[in-house]
């Protein structure tokens, strides 16, 4: 957008401070909008110590002599900015009128004022202007963020005719302040930049089913669950087979005695007898081995008991002696 600005002269002030007023007329040719006028009053007072530089901008719409384009509107707004400045100048206030142009249009303006005093400051200012919502031509305006940069050139002291260079550049197209851009980039960074993929943790290195090893006790390995299989010697197997031949089931006292004599623990002897009984039953079921003598004896005893309990041949009952009844005369 092209803008033409026409400035008038500035009147000087007294010795204690310098001040002036100027009128600005701007022509906006590209948008076809009517011209507007704005008055500017600049006051500079000498001061000492740490002070703050207050800039108040208040605007009031000027009724256009020509009709606006469709979609353009005007709304009043107030901008208040406070920031630290050089202690060589005091408070400055100026007023200007401005228009809101059609939507989706970038507005850039550059206003220069004659130098009025020694101004040494350069800094970034971001401000937010909350405007009233307007419903005109089907458009509504919400919060508008203005982000600009004030630049002041340094100058030496002089008479009241010295001029100050004030430049204000405002851009409305930037949605974020320059101070917030690094924070926004850090928040919106992709997840791939964070924790690296394929990272292994300590809990991933733990084995779920580690192999367990048996501990050697007083008589061989300790009888703990999931222990390594015990390898019996030939002498131990011979003694266990002899005992199993006579007694398939051991009492607690006999089991402790055999474990002590064979240098085994009680649990090993107990498990060996359990496995030996299961092996014997499996072989008998397959018909590889005849029934043991004990079972045969048990079968004979059962048959004898059954024969004894079977009913014998019925014996003829002996005739009972008849008793004659004596009749009494």
Curated annotation (Swiss-Prot):
Chain positions covered by the region annotation Disordered: 208-227, 277-329
DNA-binding region in chain numbering: 225-284
Chief subcellular location: nucleus
UniProt keyword Transit peptide present: no
Entries under Gene3D superfamilies matching the protein: Homeodomain-like
Transmembrane regions: none
Protein location: Nucleus
Biased composition (Basic and acidic residues): 283-308
One Gene Ontology biological process: regulation of transcription by RNA polymerase II
Pfam families according to UniProt: Homeodomain (PF00046)
Alphabetical keyword list: Developmental protein, DNA-binding, Homeobox, Nucleus, Transcription, Transcription regulation
UniProt key word Glycosyltransferase: no
Motif Antp-type hexapeptide: positions: 200-205
Family assignment from sequence similarity: Belongs to the Antp homeobox family. Labial subfamily.
Function: Sequence-specific transcription factor. Part of a developmental regulatory system that provides cells with specific positional identities on the anterior-posterior axis.
Protein name per Swiss-Prot or TrEMBL: Homeobox protein Hox-A1a
Record organism: Danio rerio
């Amino acid at each position: 957008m092209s803008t033409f600005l026409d400035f008038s002269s500035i009147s000087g002030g007294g010795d204690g401070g310098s001040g002036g007023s100027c009128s600005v007329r701007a022509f906006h040719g590209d948008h076809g909008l009517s011209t507007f006028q704005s008055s500017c009053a600049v006051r500079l007072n000498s001061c000492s110590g740490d002070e703050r530089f207050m800039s108040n901008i208040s605007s009031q719409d000027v009724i256009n002599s020509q009709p606006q384009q469709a979609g353009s509107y005007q709304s009043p707004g107030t901008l208040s900015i406070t920031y630290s400045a050089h202690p060589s100048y005091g408070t400055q206030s100026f007023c200007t009128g401005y228009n809101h142009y059609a939507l989706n249009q970038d507005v850039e303006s550059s206003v220069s004022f004659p130098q009025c005093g020694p101004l040494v400051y350069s800094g970034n200012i971001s401000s937010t202007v909350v405007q009233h919502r307007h419903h005109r031509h089907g458009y509504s305006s919400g919060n508008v963020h203005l982000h600009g940069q004030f630049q002041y050139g340094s100058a030496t002291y002089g008479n009241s005719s010295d001029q100050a260079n004030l430049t204000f550049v405002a851009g409305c197209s930037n949605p974020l302040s320059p101070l917030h851009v690094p924070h926004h980039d850090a928040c919106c960074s992709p997840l791939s930049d964070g924790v690296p993929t394929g990272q292994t943790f300590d809990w991933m290195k733990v084995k779920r089913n580690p192999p367990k090893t048996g501990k050697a006790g007083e008589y061989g390995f300790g009888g703990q669950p999931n222990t390594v299989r015990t390898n019996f010697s030939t002498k131990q197997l011979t003694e266990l087979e002899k005992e199993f031949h006579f007694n398939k089931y051991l009492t607690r006292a006999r089991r402790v005695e055999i474990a002590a004599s064979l240098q085994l623990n009680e649990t090993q002897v107990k498990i060996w007898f359990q496995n030996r009984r299961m092996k014997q039953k499996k072989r008998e079921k397959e018909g590889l081995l005849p029934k043991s003598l004990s079972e045969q004896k048990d079968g004979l005893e059962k048959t004898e008991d059954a024969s004894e309990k079977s009913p014998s041949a019925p014996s003829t009952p002996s005739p009972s002696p008849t008793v004659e009844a004596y009749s009494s005369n």
